[in-house]
Amino acid sequence: MESRQDITNQEELWKMKPRKNLEDDYLNEDSRENSMPKRPMLVHLHQTAHFDEFDCPPELQHKQELFPKWHLPIKIAAIVSSLTFLYTLLREVIHPFVTSHQQYFYKIPILVINKVLPMVSITLLALVYLPGVIAAIVQLHNGTKYKKFPHWLDRWMVTRKQFGLLSFFFAVLHAVYSLSYPMRRSYRYKLLNWAYQQVQQNKEDAWIEHDVWRMEIYVSLGIVTLAILALLAVTSIPSVSDSLTWREFHYIQSTLGIVSLLLGTIHALIFAWNKWVDIKQFIWYTPPTFMIAVFLPTVVLICKVILLLPCLRRKILKIRHGWEDVTKINKTEMSSQL
């Protein structure tokens, strides 16, 4: 969802223009650089892209790709979801069945799935901002912004919006599944069992202070994170993004996006609370899901902090405004000649 328009040469002229005009400027600049009649072709594509099935010829319908920018994000989401589901199933269901013959298969529809959803959501959100970090490192290494990114990185950056929308989708599902917990019959039976055990132990109060604080904090952070993700999703709608200036759009998608990733990571860390040092959490010598979930977001956040250091930040901004490191460019040219 993060915009790549901040690496162009005319950034200072575009800050107060609507995003639709920015896209037109990009098209005009491409036409000037390549001296090719791209505008008629783009107009033709624009005219055919929005026809319905009654207006568009059948042969043209078959030639058009179906959601081309969604292929990579959906594949990644499917892979992460499948691996997380199998991993959680092994720990939550298979392990107790093998070791103590306890049948917890009823956990699969809600509890297991609800451990998969936040893992996929925060991973996809980290994948939105990881290519920006890699792009900054590549530009620092090359000393210029005019050298093309690798094809895989360029494709990744183009699909960041789709990664972000999928992250929001899984976050909404996670919230809905969490709200359904009290409606489950198994939860009601467990609640009765807990009350009976409290009576048997002659406990008048089952209040656990630190556990109450843990839940209050991580639920609050989860709500705020979901609200920010909703804002990011709304601003990615073309009709909304076209009404924003470049600076407004960049602030929402970049700054608030990183804030949502930070809050989501803290949400997962507080959910874990003191489970990090609990040996019982390491079933079959495997770490719990939340440990794996926060790894990639933590790496992205640390890299973002490092790139915000003044010595690196100033150089990145200079490169993105057109400055070139002559020493690195000369070394690259010499190595290419050899």
Curated annotation (Swiss-Prot):
Q: Which UniProt keywords apply?
A: Cell membrane, Endosome, FAD, Flavoprotein, Heme, Iron, Membrane, Metal-binding, Transmembrane, Transmembrane helix
Q: Which cofactor does it need?
A: FAD; heme b
Name the source's superkingdom. Eukaryota
GO molecular function terms here? heme binding; metal ion binding
Under InterPro entries, the record lists: Fe3_Rdtase_TM_dom, STEAP_metalloreductase
By its UniProt entry, which Pfam families does this protein fall under?
Ferric_reduct
* Assembly description: Homotrimer.
- What role does it play? Does not function as a metalloreductase due to the absence of binding sites for the electron-donating substrate NADPH.
Recorded family membership: Belongs to the STEAP family.
Q: What is the name attached to this protein's record?
A: STEAP1 protein
Task: Tell me which species this is from.
Answer: Sus scrofa (Pig)
